[in-house]
Amino acid sequence: MLRLQWAVVAAILCCSGIVLSSCNDSSENMTSDLTPLAAWQAGKVVTAEAVSDYGGVDKCFAAEPIPDGVWQSMQGRTYKENPDIGRDDLRHIRALHWDYDNQIHIGEMVCNKVIADRLVKILRQLYDARYPIQRMLLPDVYNADDEMQMRDNNSSCFCYRNIAAATNLSKHARGIAVDINTLYNPYYKVLEDGSLFIQPATAAAYCDRDWDFPYKIDHDDLCFKLFTEAGFEWGGDWETCKDYQHFELIE
């Protein structure tokens, strides 16, 4: 199902004029070529040999000023003119991550410079532990459509937007909140009319945290431990709603 969803995403975005460098997670996409690493093609699957030839794992984890190409792709998508945050406040994160098929993916995020070093360290610790993260693409790949990227189980950080089902800005709008493995760790809230708002809408089954399934975040999970030890709070502990994918900086 997730592979089908990704094919649909790719088709939609190609029709929208957004070029996906190579975001397929199949083994056919695996390569020992250094080009994907040199060009930092997020979503590409690479071999350990390619990583070694590129310069090693250390070279693949870094925080840098937003590159021109990334900044251009963010315009009108994750970034909109606003009084709260600008380009100089943000950093582009390069990282590697493992999936459940034991393959290495190239990943990237944009975050606030305040959390950049901490986020790089956490992602490196997750990589070293072979913690599975299915996708780590910029939300701009999905035209900053939060529902679409969450259905695709994408992990991300910065997006200038409001809180789901609310009118105030999300911590994602400042780049100080990170969502991990979003399909399996949904957001849900009981609305004033008694109805249940779930995001992504396809994740209703994963609101039940009493059963085990891949990518599940709970108090025993390494992702929870690393983020909370680094000064983040987990949305799964909130009382008025639950946001199991969400870690935000405690201010």
Model-found features: residue ranges?
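Active-site acidic/histidine clusters and adjacent loop/turn architecture
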Residues: 85-150
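Bacterial N-terminal signal peptides
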Residues: 9-18
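Active-site-adjacent substructure of cysteine-protease-like catalytic cores
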Residues: 145-173
